[in-house]
Amino acid sequence: GIVSVPLVLDGTSFAVDVPKVLEALRTDPSIKMVFLCSPGNPTGSLLSRESIQAVLDCPDYNGLVIVDEAYIDFPLEEQAMGLRYVGESISAVDLVPSYANLVVSQTLSKSFGLAGVRLGVAFAQPPTIQIMNNTKAPYSISAPSAYFAAQALSPEGIAKMRACTRTLIENRRQLIEALGDVPNLGRVLGNNDANFVLVQVLRDGEPSSERASEVYHAMAQNHGLMVRNRSAELGCAGCLRISVGTPEENARAVALLTQLLGDASA
């Protein structure tokens, strides 16, 4: 079975509940794999290096720790000289040489925009990679997928991805700023480390899952604009997840939210 240890919400940020994870590992010897998402979906929060290492250093556990970094290219750091792309430096990949039980997974589906090729990558020490190679299906990567992956991971492809990611990060900043002016929207939750924004929908000043669902259906069915209703997920009461688009797409979403949430019957 699955042992679930919910994230904790500290203010607007989601984080691993390290003490409870360690307690679960100490008391349940049946656990063989730990999955951590950094950044998470829909939390949009990058996990701290300290929390990942705390799990890796657990003396009561010798199974695998798998860190899913599907959204790793979207966080940023605020620097004195402006915005700096830091996707590589915040990855857990550089911990792999120090931990034989660590596997870090990434994908071409998000920042590279190649979801159709269905291709990802795992970083781990050679013995673990050998086990994966021994158990995977033969010829599991098609020739077209391999071709597009090689193009994406070329110096030119990575430069293009980084340029697009910088644009998205700026669009995300503008979207968050614009959402602050929408009536009956509450806090933006998470650290906004992914290509989406998680925001609370309010009724009478409190997060309302019912109203979030109403707005979600109105946007999709009446206006053809799809966001994600995440209000049923733990810690996400009343929340919609809005993917970051172009400035024009973001402006349309903000205008529609303003229209719907300014209407008491929405």
How should each PLM-predicted stretch be described?
Residues 50, 208, 221-222, 232-266:
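PLP-dependent enzyme catalytic core of the Aspartate aminotransferase-like
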Residues 168-169, 181-223, 240, 244:
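Conserved PLP-binding catalytic core of the aspartate aminotransferase-like
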Residues 12-79, 83-84:
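Active-site phosphate-binding strand-loop segment of PLP-dependent enzymes
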Residues 5-11:
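Short beta->alpha connector loops at strand-helix junctions that form conserved
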Residues 95, 101-181, 187-189:
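PLP-dependent aminotransferase class I/II
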